[in-house]
């Protein structure tokens, strides 16, 4: 009789048991551009890209979208790039509402230099946001509206097919992501026009 193949013998020369999974040790065979990323402590690292969106506070429309390789600083870099693309060289004061992940001294300083008031949720310790920002009524309003950012992402995953995309490579997935965000805006228009 022939020896039966078991899954244990498949990669006998490679054993990652007890080792940390990093982008240096693990790569996607289907999409080499995807990177391992942990969303929060206690969750597993997954091969993925990171989608970013810039919303306007009034109606929650996506005005800018981008997709990057996943890493710990991609969100802040993408936010600065989207702000510069949205209003290049603007001297009009803008505000940016964001969650605690954006409360970093370098990011807040870059926003202030770009004439943008950072309405970023404060970390409990070592926050870069001080009282001169939080005392204004606009800060509380931005914190209330920043939760709207989750709606287009939820729509993109459930309706837009972005939970697991068929496309490979950053450029193709980015194009699909931006198209999905535009479709989300179009899907919301009839409700807003009817109001």
Which residues are covered by each model-predicted region?
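Hydrophobic, well-ordered secondary-structure elements that form the walls
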Residues: 96-99, 111, 118, 150-152, ...
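Short, small-residue-rich loop/turn micro-motifs
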Residues: 57-59, 122, 157
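Short, charged, surface-exposed secondary-structure boundary motifs
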Residues: 127-134
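RNase H-like polynucleotidyl transferase catalytic core
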Residues: 116-126
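Polybasic low-complexity intrinsically disordered regions
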Residues: 1-112, 184
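Basic, amphipathic alpha-helical segments enriched in Lys/Arg and hydrophobic/aromatic residues
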Residues: 139-195
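Composition- and surface-driven signal marking solvent-exposed, interaction-prone regions
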Residues: 65-68, 108-113, 123, 167-171, ...
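C-terminal, active-site-flanking charged/polar segments
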Residues: 107, 112-117, 180, 188
